[in-house]
């Protein structure tokens, strides 16, 4: 890719991201505000839009979002829920759990869907869930969440259910040194993502 092509790709991505951000529902903007109040980074608008689109297109009615700092992803899924749907958000930190509870108080005024937040370590919590109970699993946050979710997914997912791993390039973690694009990045997230890709492929 030459410099002109690179710059055009960058401009295109910036345009798409700006447009998607402008289209985000109020609940998602509230999630971003909560993240900013705690000086936590939030994901791109495009990632949130992709999750919302996938949830809608797949017809998933029972969704679980796993990961510390996944407030924006949770909000985007919440905005796409039907009244009979169920959303469970799992966060291992008291701070993240509190943020989700605040967000769900607002979401409860917008939907009749079942909203549940759990303050637990996903590596221990997932094994206690009922099997064959979810259509969609979204995995975010700490490196340890990914292998735990991958291991439990065959048991937890219904037929045709799907698991989505966010930040597979390991660029969003605080200790990222370029993630998978940098072979020298040996941070926990980068190492875990390399192992996950090897396991999946």
Which residue stretches match the model-derived regions?
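A short alpha-helical cap/connector motif
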Residues: 1-136, 143-164, 168-201
